[in-house]
Amino acid sequence: MDPQYARLVKAAALSATVLASILLIIKIFAWWHTGSVSLLAALVDSLVDLAASLTNLFVVRYSLQPADEEHTFGHGKAESLAALAQSMFISGSALFLFLTGFQHLASPEPLQDPGLGIWVTLIALFSTLILVTFQRWVVRKTQSQAIRADMLHYQSDVMMNGAILIALALSWYGFHRADALFALGIGAYILYSALRMGYEAVQALLDRALPDDERQEIINIVTSWPGVIGAHDLRTRQSGPTRFIQLHLEMEDMLPLMEAHILADQVERALLHRFPGADILIHQDPTAVVPKERHAHWEL
């Protein structure tokens, strides 16, 4: 396990947990004083944020454990489970927002002290922007699915806080249904984000292949290597930070076993240089045993 990967994902998960805890306390105070349904929506979302970020923190720590006798491929899929759990948390909060929004749309109430709500929302907006910027940088460095899911979650929070600001301002000027309307819009966006996040997590758990551009890079590296006649049966997947790459190399029929082994090792090192930490399995085939329709065949 790359020490930098472990350090970055732990820092990102811990930062999200701390921020969610602070914002939850602030929003409870603000909602109590204003009665805003949009702030209630933000409060519920912060509660879900905290639960999701705590889950993320513990799961990320577990996923970083090295492979053992019972989990020979490591614990990386725990990240996908964390993302799936987050999608469920977020879906639940979206449904709550729909119910509350419809209730207040039918019976709108004037807000108490909307100025306080605006200040609290501004604090939440800028602090969440800082967190999302940090998380995006971590995802760019690590490709962590759990942190990417958390980042998508907090990106929806940024949108939500912006919408709440508009709703509070409109309510201040007498348009009291704006609060409920924006709560419904926020709920719809959060539900969409949750469904997208859940889909990505399920695809990872089902061992979806690596993206087309990465598989094309693998093909380019292998087929351009001196001594490699062709290749077939490329299989790829990703579990946590680890990419798994399997393929068959086609070589000269009479190539000595030691030379075939050395050639396969060279290809493996070239792939590891491009995809550090990857788990690579290469099978060597003499061209005579490969059916004609499979020569130099790759499934993309």
From Swiss-Prot:
One of its GO terms (molecular function) is cadmium ion transmembrane transporter activity. It catalyses: Zn(2+)(in) + H(+)(out) = Zn(2+)(out) + H(+)(in); Cd(2+)(in) + H(+)(out) = Cd(2+)(out) + H(+)(in); Fe(2+)(in) + H(+)(out) = Fe(2+)(out) + H(+)(in). InterPro entries: Cation_efflux, Cation_efflux_CTD, Cation_efflux_CTD_sf, Cation_efflux_FieF, Cation_efflux_TMD_sf, CDF_Transporter. GO terms for cellular component: plasma membrane. Keywords: Cell inner membrane, Cell membrane, Ion transport, Iron, Iron transport, Membrane, Metal-binding, Transmembrane, Transmembrane helix, Transport, Zinc, Zinc transport. The chain crosses the membrane at residues 12-32, 40-60, 82-102, 114-134, 164-184. It is a multi-pass membrane protein. Zn(2+) binds at D45, D49, H153, D157. GO terms for biological process: intracellular zinc ion homeostasis. Its main location: membrane. It is found in: Cell inner membrane. Belongs to the cation diffusion facilitator (CDF) transporter (TC 2.A.4) family. FieF subfamily. Homodimer. PANTHER family: CATION-EFFLUX PUMP FIEF, MITOCHONDRIAL METAL TRANSPORTER 1-RELATED. Divalent metal cation transporter which exports Zn(2+), Cd(2+) and possibly Fe(2+). May be involved in zinc and iron detoxification by efflux. This is Cation-efflux pump FieF. It comes from Yersinia enterocolitica serotype O:8 / biotype 1B (strain NCTC 13174 / 8081).
